[in-house]
UniProtKB/Swiss-Prot annotation:
<feature type="active site" description="Proton donor">
    <location>
        <position position="207"/>
    </location>
</feature>
<dbReference type="GO" id="GO:0004634">
    <property type="term" value="F:phosphopyruvate hydratase activity"/>
</dbReference>
<keyword id="KW-0460">Magnesium</keyword>
<dbReference type="InterPro" id="IPR020809">
    <property type="entry name" value="Enolase_CS"/>
</dbReference>
<keyword id="KW-0964">Secreted</keyword>
<dbReference type="GO" id="GO:0006096">
    <property type="term" value="P:glycolytic process"/>
</dbReference>
<feature type="binding site">
    <location>
        <position position="386"/>
    </location>
    <ligand>
        <name>(2R)-2-phosphoglycerate</name>
    </ligand>
</feature>
<keyword id="KW-0456">Lyase</keyword>
<dbReference type="InterPro" id="IPR020810">
    <property type="entry name" value="Enolase_C"/>
</dbReference>
<dbReference type="InterPro" id="IPR029017">
    <property type="entry name" value="Enolase-like_N"/>
</dbReference>
<dbReference type="GO" id="GO:0000015">
    <property type="term" value="C:phosphopyruvate hydratase complex"/>
</dbReference>
<feature type="binding site">
    <location>
        <position position="365"/>
    </location>
    <ligand>
        <name>(2R)-2-phosphoglycerate</name>
    </ligand>
</feature>
<feature type="binding site">
    <location>
        <position position="244"/>
    </location>
    <ligand>
        <name>Mg(2+)</name>
    </ligand>
</feature>
<dbReference type="InterPro" id="IPR020811">
    <property type="entry name" value="Enolase_N"/>
</dbReference>
<dbReference type="GO" id="GO:0000287">
    <property type="term" value="F:magnesium ion binding"/>
</dbReference>
<dbReference type="InterPro" id="IPR036849">
    <property type="entry name" value="Enolase-like_C_sf"/>
</dbReference>
<feature type="active site" description="Proton acceptor">
    <location>
        <position position="335"/>
    </location>
</feature>
Amino acid sequence: MFDVVISDIEAREILDSRGYPTLCVKVITNTGTFGEACVPSGASTGIKEALELRDKDPKRYQGKGVLQAISNVEKVLVPALQGFSVFDQITADAIMIDADGTPNKEKLGANAILGVSLALAKAAANTLQRPLYRYLGGSFSHVLPCPMMNLINGGMHATNGLQFQEFMIRPISAPSLKEAVRMGAEVFNALKKILQNRQLATGVGDEGGFAPNLASNAEALDLLLTAIETAGFTPREDISLALDCAASSFYNTQDKTYDGKSYADQVGILAELCEHYPIDSIEDGLAEEDFEGWKLLSETLGDRVQLVGDDLFVTNSALIAEGIAQGLANAVLIKPNQIGTLTETAEAIRLATIQGYATILSHRSGETEDTTIADLAVAFNTGQIKTGSLSRSERIAKYNRLMAIEEEMGPEALFQDSNPFSKA
């Protein structure tokens, strides 16, 4: 094949699932093939995440427009990348990082850079007429991830007063991805009927989970257990529970407390919940700045529960290495838009995996119809994925893509949960 190079890059403003603008980027090659990617956006963000560039023009979208990011693609990244091989992802990402020249991509915007980075990989895959997961992962990528399904939303993803942000189920006894989705959908619909019978709200939050007004985190967990059993499954054996506390959102940085409680109290609360409920994964149980709290949590629960760092690590290899050295957490949430390029995302996964940390590919609360993360989870054999509830099309699109990949692979597909603390 003759050289296939980048001939043009187009960027446009679209809307995400919250009705706010984001970027859709198309990389076009000299052969006419192209790849297109849409960039997600988070509500609960880590302070060390790469910068999502917004226009801050109050006359457009309450200041959340992305016209400047689009301009940076067209005026900076297009001339920097035109003529480069569509297959040289590492070089292209390095060029964009250098063009930005800041530690957190604040000059050009991580949203601009990531859109180009992901679209480039898709253009290369399409040029070779290969699915993205196969192009990136090669013939050894055949693991379908166990999903973490967010059935009850709280925290910054809803307005219902629940302290924790996500109450999830994990279909750990499923023999396949398709069956895992079925199990999740049946529990989701059972939960809806339970809420209706109790005259609780069945409106959904940002990630498609229900957002009823509940008195406590324990009440949300009790509802999940009831829904699991109503759907005909056994808690712990068939389906386990997972939490995303998003503890930074209720952490007071001045007096270093969690709604007035010490980090030891917070660890105690989580330990007690794990005693009473079949919880095998807790994300961001402590605030990203609370290293002492994270250390205590890791010492207390790290030998029996998956402790996931999201805000703690923000998909940044340097922060992951630092956390590993301090013995913090035992798993890493992977969000490409936290770091801004596909190359850096892959490096974060590689580093965590080498050190024995589990990895979970994740969506953001502000999503689009783009299904790239489904392919990335398979390409990098993460074994776990977070992509929301069993409602809202931007969430369902990822599940449908995973099921399509599984069917395409046939007997080669392996559904495998990478959480070492799974009870199944």
